[in-house]
Curated annotation (Swiss-Prot):
Sequence similarity: Belongs to the MnmG family.
A GO molecular-function annotation: flavin adenine dinucleotide binding
Name of the featured protein: tRNA uridine 5-carboxymethylaminomethyl modification enzyme MnmG
Source species: Paramagnetospirillum magneticum (strain ATCC 700264 / AMB-1)
Gene: mnmG
Function: NAD-binding protein involved in the addition of a carboxymethylaminomethyl (cmnm) group at the wobble position (U34) of certain tRNAs, forming tRNA-cmnm(5)s(2)U34.
Any one GO BP annotation for this protein: tRNA wobble uridine modification
Residue numbers binding FAD: G23, A24, G25, H26, A27, G28
Location(s), subcellular: Cytoplasm
UniProt keyword annotations, A-Z: Cytoplasm, FAD, Flavoprotein, NAD, tRNA processing
Length: 637
């Protein structure tokens, strides 16, 4: 066992710190860095230091809604955006032809570069130490976590623990009829922590995920395949990255065939998901290829993206054919795919089952309701995806550090960020399948865009203590540019006749319009307006992009701001954790049971529980208001 910066822990020795983070995947790295940025003495515990920041499944960051999460993590001074900017080998803005609210940045990553860049970022973080070892138990005293017991018998005393174990909790790999315990291929599972969580009274369940085979790119017939190039120039994730310097590569595109599907159908009884070997639920929106063939029986082809895993790595990730079929079936199946007829399989795909905690057992701070100082983040909360995990990790790590300092947690709501939407969904509704983020989950997505995440969150992060001076200074420069740009756009005005003489087709209604007003016209952007007012050429880069979006959607944004004010009135009405729902006579038994199970923290959270009717919300509101009134009036003398 090694501990950087603190020296070496000896067996049976007890050491101490403020926050211990268990697991160094995407959630753990962000949790540890956030706690350390706040100033907490933090230890990041992992079985193997060389796997810190490992991309266990696909070699990509971002995507629809996920890209917004990465921008939000970056706005809070998290690591993921800067790390992918250093390791990305293909950048694309998805849904570029659609509105700004549903666009999403995505990047292919060089796995090794990503891992090295994450390790370097952690090594540069003050107050953070990296420890190689395995957590086996928790020390819980008087309902509060007090330390972590390691496999060698040593103990780390601490004020808070963040568990970010991914798929390691009682992980079980399935490859056809074969099964073996593992956290992922090559790593042992975590058994003791599952038992510790059960002893602490946390409700555990099982979920499943999977990954495809890995291919040798030197044996792929690339010339016969379509190519997918990245954007040129590539758009960075981090607000601090000026430009991408890593060499860029293309991906290949192919598809399954009827012959592929015939092989899969002929071997379904050997597929763990269909033989009854796997009982857990997998991710609905990332199904295995055997699931696709069964659920979409009329489809003759399913698209596959062949994604290089690195600049100096011949491994290719075939995105779209995740499977746990036996290895011989996988080999036969892959040989029927165009371009892969002679392809060598480096490693077969597999499925993995693992424990998770029902996230309804958490506060919105991601602290468990039953054990003070114990925080959970990532797949342990029922989510899937690097970005979802990283976002939870940042919030859990920051709030763990704030708890140690005696400060109130930072809680983001549904109008603040996709981070707030995700956490609210989890703790209010729970999940019976791996949860992933979508733009459709966010009611206020027009405001929760990728371009303005810093405007929304960097001031909150600065106030909460997780944004450093370098990022704050850069943010203030951009904020000043936005303020000057808005003032300039609103100051430049013209009548319809004058604007028509400048070549702009405007209704002759006599209304004088500003350049800001004209941005609402779909055909008019800053470039067109700069031909009329050359001083607008001074606006460029991220400032120009954000101003153009704000101007275009100004009317819609105003209406959404009004919706948010109404939402926050409900969100501001807190519900007591010991509220007696049996005392509200007008509630049905079904609604009463749902409210008791979820114990929502606010009226708005109660309204989002499936089956809780508007009438029930009204009854709940009336009951709470009566309680407040009775309390204010006090006993009659």
């Amino acid at each position: 066992m090694r501990l950087t910066k603190y020296g070496v822990f000896h067996v049976k020795q007890t050491s101490s710190c403020d926050v211990v983070v268990i697991g160094a995947g995407h959630a753990g790295c962000e949790a540890a860095a956030a706690a350390a940025r706040f100033g907490a003495r933090t230890v990041l515990l992992t079985q193997r230091l060389e796997t810190i920041g490992e991309m266990s499944c696909n070699p990509a960051i971002g995507g629809l809604a996920k890209g917004q999460l990465v921008r939000e993590i970056d706005a809070m001074d998290g690591l993921m955006g800067r790390v992918i900017d250093r390791a990305g080998i293909q950048f694309r803005i998805l849904n570029r032809s659609k509105g700004a609210a549903v666009q999403g940045p995505r990047a292919q990553a060089d796995r090794k570069l990503y891992r090295l860049a994450m390790r370097a970022a952690l090594d540069e973080t003050e107050n953070l130490s990296l420890l190689e070892g395995s957590a086996e138990d928790l020390v819980i005293t008087d309902g509060r976590v007090a330390g972590v017991v390691l496999a060698d018998g040593s103990t780390i005393a601490c004020g808070a623990v963040v568990i970010t174990t991914g798929t390691f909790l009682r992980g079980l790999i399935h490859l056809g009829e074969k099964t073996w315990p593992a956290g992922r291929v090559g790593d042992a599972p975590s058994l003791g922590l599952s038992l510790a969580l059960e002893r602490a009274g946390l409700p555990l369940g099982r979920l499943k995920t999977g990954t495809p085979a890995r291919l040798d790119g030197r044996t792929i017939h690339w010339d016969s395949l379509d190519r997918q190039e990245g954007d040129d120039p590539p758009v960075p994730f981090s607000y601090l990255t000026e430009r991408i310097t890593t060499p860029q590569v293309a991906c290949g595109i192919t598809a399954t065939t009827p012959e592929t599907h015939a092989i899969i159908r002929a071997n379904l009884e050997r597929a763990p998901m269909y033989s009854g070997q796997i009982q857990s639920t997998g991710p609905r929106y990332c199904p295995s290829i055997e699931d696709k063939v069964v659920r979409f029986a009329d489809r003759e082809r399913h698209q596959i993206f062949l994604e290089p895993e690195g600049l100096d790595d011949h491994t290719v990730y075939p995105n779209g054919i995740s499977t746990s079929l036996p290895e011989d079936v996988q080999l036969a199946m892959i040989a029927t795919i165009p371009g892969l007829e002679q392809c060598r399989v480096i490693r077969p795909g597999y499925a993995i089952e693992y424990d998770f905690v029902d996230p309804r057992a958490l506060h919105r701070s991601l602290e468990t309701k039953g054990v003070g100082g114990l925080f959970l983040a990532g797949q342990i909360n029922g989510t899937t995806g690097y970005e979802e995990a990283a976002g939870q990790g940042l919030m859990a790590g920051l709030n763990a550090a704030r708890r140690c300092a005696g400060s109130a947690p930072l809680v983001l709501d549904r109008a603040d960020a996709y981070l707030g939407v995700m956490i609210d969904d989890l703790v209010s509704l729970g999940t019976s399948e791996p949860y992933r983020m979508f733009t459709s989950r966010a009611e206020y997505r027009l405001l929760l865009r990728a371009d303005n995440a810093d405007s929304r969150l960097t001031p909150k992060g600065r106030e909460a203590g997780c944004v450093d001076s370098e990022r704050w200074a850069a943010f203030m420069v951009k904020a000043a540019g936005l303020e000057r740009g808005r003032a300039l756009l609103q100051s430049l005005k013209g009548s319809p006749d004058w604007l028509r003489r400048q070549g702009l087709e405007i209704n002759r209604d006599g209304v004088v319009r500003s350049a800001w007003d004209l941005l609402a016209y779909p055909e008019l952007g800053l470039q067109a307006l700069a031909a009329v007012w050359p001083e607008l050429d001074s606006l460029s880069g991220a400032v120009a992009e954000q101003l153009e979006i704000e101007g275009r959607y100004a009317g819609y944004l105003d209406r959404q701001e009004a919706d948010i004010r109404a939402y926050r009135r409900e969100e501001g009405l807190a519900l007591s954790a010991d509220l007696d729902y049996d005392a509200i006579g007008s509630l049905s038994n079904e609604v009463r049971q749902k409210l008791k199970a979820a114990r929502p923290e606010t009226l708005a959270a109660a309204a989002r529980i499936p089956g809780v009717t508007p009438a029930a919300v009204t009854a709940l509101l009336g009951h709470v208001k009566k309680m407040v009134l009775d309390w204010a009036e006090g006993p009659v003398p």
